[in-house]
């Protein structure tokens, strides 16, 4: 979908008499969307994620976010973002990695993840690049590995990559005591269970794990609205949004 499409969908579902009084963008394209739609606020993604995570766990001290293409670990100290570690270069620890394998085996991501829950001998993929994991999985298939064992092995590898290659912890217990996991990859129960097994803890996975950034931005908009003297939003109306046009050009 698109930003415009999402906004139209929101407006179509608003109850009669309800209006948007404050707005906030975040994530990739945050400044662009804020400028294009004249939004009231724009906030960096890490802060939005913290707002969302602290809604579910006020004492959160670590946020692990694994999306389709990247992953990040946000450490919280004294209710403030203390450090951020990000991986964008390699997809071997991300959701797209599991999705690719599921499709290659003619499974949906959901069915592939479900298989992992019944694994008896998960294959050990360690913390490798996608290229090496591909060959390791193919070798395991030749040796007769069950789909469940492959799926569980991949779930473990996602977490091992996140913890030991990106965050570079020597002991998973170093992460924190109040951990919130989020990002679409954590909708996969096998990935969640792998994390809890390796980290030796119980993590909080909100049922909106895949849209925590947007939820955090909404919380920020609500909070800052309360501090405003002028209660009118600067955001374009739905009619103005419908009339938006754009042009593209190329230059050397």
Question: What do these predicted ranges mean?
Answer:
Residues 1-20:
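N-terminal phosphate-binding loop and adjacent alpha-helix
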Residues 6-12, 30-67, 72-83, 167-170, ...:
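Conserved phosphate-binding catalytic cores of ATP/NTP-utilizing and phosphoryl-transfer enzymes
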Residues 40-41, 45-46, 196-215:
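Conserved phosphate-binding/catalytic loops in two-lobed NTP-binding clefts
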Residues 72, 223-252:
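Acidic, glycine/GT-rich loop-and beta-edge segments that sit at the periphery of enzyme/chaperone cores
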Residues 78-121, 210-213, 219-223:
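Glycine-rich phosphate-binding loop plus the immediately following alpha-helix
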Residues 135-164:
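Adenine-nucleotide phosphate-binding core of ATP-dependent small-molecule kinases
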Residues 28-29, 157, 170-198, 209-213:
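Glycine-rich phosphate-binding loops at beta-strand->alpha-helix junctions
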